[in-house]
Amino acid sequence: MDIIKLKHITKRYDDGFIALKDINITIESGKFYSLLGPSGSGKSTILRIIAGFTQPSSGQVFFDGKDITDLDASKRHINTVFQNYALFPHLNVFENVAFGLKIKKKPLNEIRPAVKDALHMVRLDGYANREISELSGGQQQRVAIARAIVNEPKVLLLDESLSALDKRLRKDMQFELRAIQKKLGITFIFVTHDQEEALSMSDEIFVLNDGQIQQSGSPVAIYDEPVNDFVARFIGDSNILPGRMIKDYVVEFANNKFRCADGGIKSNEKVEVVIRPEDLDIVAPEKGKIVVTAQTQLFLGDHFEIKAIDANENEWLIHSTNGVKLGQRIGLFFDPEDIHVMRLNESQKDFDARIEKYEGDENED
């Protein structure tokens, strides 16, 4: 069931800067969504428009089928957890979580059990009387979430809310947030510039750049089938090479022809080829589909990151559990399914239509 729809949302500021360009988004109830993109891509502006803190220049916002474009933020069934958590330092944990309920003039006999349940949900039982200054960053994060969910919103918005935490705590909170969302069964919309956060937590991701949605879909679909160069480079590490489509299932790059899993592209059309570094296997040069020379190598704990160059001066990034010697000639082996072919300047709409048509033609055969 759809809970939020943005239709043709544009945001233009007085200085002429266009933050959002014809944004169309559908959010289903009970799922975890991420708005992912670099700084200035428009992701936080979308969040603020959904929350009611910012008005769009044009377009409509729908909530449960009703137009709420002009509805005051306080009247929306939506709560927000901000990047700095916005906790009140002069109030203890209980008072922070209870704040919204007190504003609504709820009686104390309703507030106490509601706050207790919210703190239990975020695993902060026994912390009600703690001062905010006594809490770690992760605990403050959970208090902010408890304060938001105690109001029983239908949608929870989180604006870069893990960015202030250290790497280990950020990883722990990814599991925590996903678990909380599953328990509550409400819609989470999470804004981040961190691809790992988006990939690990989301049911669906919207990738933004320059005020436009570049691609939307499941984490697996976006990682395995980026629609353009920006998405391929922004989501994970990639080897991206210029190529030419020979025919269905055959593509040429690095002066060789290779079997691939892509079709529906014109013969001789210029394309870009994406191969993820973890899909490259290091083999003996005579067994490799491509031969490269190792240039640099970093040990990253669970794998080596190797940069190499082929005879055509193409650079290759390889992730391997085995290291190599610098200057060593090595073979790279990959399967047809490891090759992803991208058309130049193809939109997601055109990409989806091509795949649907091509797969439909295959089924008829």
UniProtKB/Swiss-Prot annotation:
Amino-acid positions noted as binding ATP in the UniProt annotation, renumbered to this chain: G37, P38, S39, G40, S41, G42, K43, S44
Membrane topology annotation: Peripheral membrane protein
Enzyme class: translocase
Top-rank taxon: Bacteria
UniProt EC number: 7.6.2.11
Any one Gene Ontology molecular-function term assigned to this protein's record: ATP binding
Keywords: ATP-binding, Cell membrane, Membrane, Nucleotide-binding, Translocase, Transport
Residue ranges of domain ABC transporter in the record: 4-235
Keyword Translocase: yes
Protein's recorded name: Spermidine/putrescine import ATP-binding protein PotA
Source organism phylogeny: Bacteria, Bacillati, Bacillota, Bacilli, Lactobacillales
Gene assigned in the entry: potA
